[in-house]
UniProtKB/Swiss-Prot annotation:
Cofactor descriptive note: May bind 1 zinc ion per subunit.
Residues annotated as binding ATP: Q87, G105, E106, G107, K108, T109, D512
Taxonomic source organism: Klebsiella pneumoniae (strain 342)
Family as reported in the entry's similarity comment: Belongs to the SecA family.
Cellular location(s): Cell inner membrane; Cytoplasm
Cofactor: Zn(2+)
Full protein name: Protein translocase subunit SecA
Residues holding Zn(2+): C885, C887, C896, H897
UniProt topology in membrane: Peripheral membrane protein
EC numbers: 7.4.2.8
Disordered, as annotated region: 852-901
Chemical reaction(s) catalysed: ATP + H2O + cellular proteinSide 1 = ADP + phosphate + cellular proteinSide 2
PANTHER family (UniProt xref): CHLOROPLAST PROTEIN-TRANSPORTING ATPASE, SECA INNER MEMBRANE COMPONENT OF SEC PROTEIN SECRETION SYSTEM
Gene: secA
Composition bias, Basic residues: 891-901
Amino acid sequence: MLIKMLTKVFGSRNDRTLRRMRKVVNIINGMEPAMEKLSDDELKAKTAEFRARLEKGEVLENLIPEAFAVVREASKRVFGMRHFDVQLLGGMVLNDRCIAEMRTGEGKTLTATLPAYLNALTGKGVHVVTVNDYLAQRDAENNRPLFEFLGMSVGINMSGLPAPAKREAYAADITYGTNNEYGFDYLRDNMAFSPEERVQRKLHYALVDEVDSILIDEARTPLIISGPAEDSSEMYRKVNKIIPHLIRQEKEDSDTFTGEGHFSVDEKARQVNLTERGLVLIEELLVQEGIMEEGESLYSPTNIMLMHHVTAALRAHALFTRDVDYIVKDGEVIIVDEHTGRTMQGRRWSDGLHQAVEAKEGVEIQNENQTLASITFQNYFRLYEKLAGMTGTADTEAFEFSSIYKLDTVVVPTNRPMIRKDMADLVYMTEAEKIQAIIEDIKTRTAAGQPVLVGTISIEKSEVVSRELTKAGIKHNVLNAKFHASEADIVAQAGYPAAVTIATNMAGRGTDIMLGGSWQAEVAALENPTAEQIEKIKADWQVRHDAVLAAGGLHIIGTERHESRRIDNQLRGRAGRQGDAGSSRFYLSMEDALMRIFASDRVSGMMRKLGMKPGEAIEHPWVTKAIANAQRKVESRNFDIRKQLLEYDDVANDQRRAIYTQRNELLDVSDVSETINSIREDVFKATIDAHIPPQSLEEMWDIEGLQERLKNDFDLELPIKEWLDKEPELHEETLRERILQSAVETYQRKEEVVGAEMMRHFEKGVMLQTLDSLWKEHLAAMDYLRQGIHLRGYAQKDPKQEYKRESFSMFAAMLESLKYEVISTLSKVQVRMPEEVEAMEQQRREEAERLAQMQQLSHQSDDEAAAEDLAAQTGERKVGRNDPCPCGSGKKYKQCHGRLS
């Protein structure tokens, strides 16, 4: 109550921010007459003037009024479009490192030109980030004439562009591209083998369109560049045959309940758990199929990979549904984005899940991949000096933007008042009753000439509604991932009188639905339209537009509540743009996923008390409130998952930054011999210490072991035993110096054969390659550690602290391995002639390029299955990385359980 009173007196933080910015808008408006008097050349010259002022030390913020006035005037001359005052406000919000919430149809694309121009004046580059290539290309081409008029260059960063074209795109003042491509380029730059191979500049200012989609919906999706791992497709096929024999039971076994089934599914956590009966049956079936030896347990360390296959297959069958989570097209399993309903070509689930789904669907199983480099969007976008974003729906996620990205959200008012009617939800007992009610509503609306947009949450649901509409004889268009190509055409004509369009979630985001249809699309369909034809099309459109407005504007029907209120608001936001009339309503049933998982018992009880009859709907504030609470529960759960993911990724991020900084320093120098000499001293000291403990008695020295180690690991045959026999007075210090000196002399003799320049080149290559190889193995080991770390909670330890502690030890061990392997490789190298070395170098580069091409955006599950706890017992012999694994698999230790330790 007190907060409400204070807000009334002083205004909210949002009101105060807008009040401050409106003063600047008045200054910009005051400059308009002076700008109108300038000639084109004088207006263009302003860019050079601003840049000169910045070079002399003027602050960018001081240029806002003048720079915005220049862009507004240029837009009037180039496009015939004048920025509204609210768009100027939006531009200032975006320059202030904030999120601007601007409703659909308020002209976000034009608003973005203001801060993009202002920040490009610094010459450090501006990255405009969109959700797909189509929008990046569209926005870049639409705004190019304006920026080029003002003397700014525009680049488009598309996937598949060759490196020189990418470098050119990044060198432009303003670059348009997708979030994936910017992230991948960052990772690829950090896998480059020469400074010339890098394409990005320093990350300066990112302006993110549909910021909620990229920074929140995509936050759990790490970008992963991967290379091929071992082929285990046959194992996926074998395990897949076993799963149909298992029976699902409703809940997990406990002290009070023992079911008859073999596995239970936790829909909320998206986990599958085997019961005792299930484990026994699985083991029997695996033995029958000859996959596992009789008498073995699925949980024994030797079967850890088999357990991984079983878990992946179970999840593929129990949690992932065709036409909801993925579609099968041209013999390929393609993921469907749960937030937008779009297909995500080229993305694959990780942890063998994608292969398990391929086995389930009987399509070709593609090889598993090994991570070479990865980063989450959360950590990538936090690398920018300055970050801002815009969307139609950010207010519900304001807390997350603030706590994770340190970005405040400012709600920018609409240019015209919003008059859309949002009606209360209608709740039915069954799905069938709900669908019937939707059909009746559509009939009523279309009879009056009102266009209808039906939003569904999956392809499967959109096809159910489509079938019912076909039965009822209602003509309609379906917009889902299967009909991706015709998306823009369908959206353009969704505002026709009595048009019915079914859309999965919000496929088609970024394109406005014009009431009466799009006259621009009709003009574009003609080859060489005459002025008369264009006038006639416009006149016809005006008649249709007025008819649709009179009928009540676009009507939105939601067939189900989404987990997030934000996605529901996006659907509603398709109607009522720019002050147009419109209406919206959600139809729900007790069989909907959200209601079943989160709100079923309370709401079902409420509905029974109110005496529900079949076909009857309930429309009550209590029910709407219960649903909103359910959504809040899911949102806060998802926020916790994302926050936890970030806390864990922050540990990896610190290590990533250290490795990439080190790598870039290596790339930028041509001579690393000083580093090599320093490392050699450390490595030889540690090697000798292992066999001759410092300040120890001669009886404790293991001379034979030292000789063998020097020969095997450093190709150095030294008669140490003879030296000691011949020279009884040989001290430990002198012996150490002699061994190191011998190593240095042997290395120098090799250098004399190939020449210093070639040796420096080779040293750098070995360091980079070894660093990449060990970093790749370290990423896999961190993955395993992350998956099983939650089990430490049972020992009353904080999993996050344990993860930090262990990952730091692993990182330190990796750096020691790096030193050792670099010196070992350089010592053992066979000297060849310069031409041969150059040929091998070329071959290595080609291999590196091939791996970099095999990029893959992986969907990391939020609920990674826990790995077996294989903590090494203290006191056991330390196994060498290249020794056979003690588990008996026949693999090298580093490729088997060494990845887990």
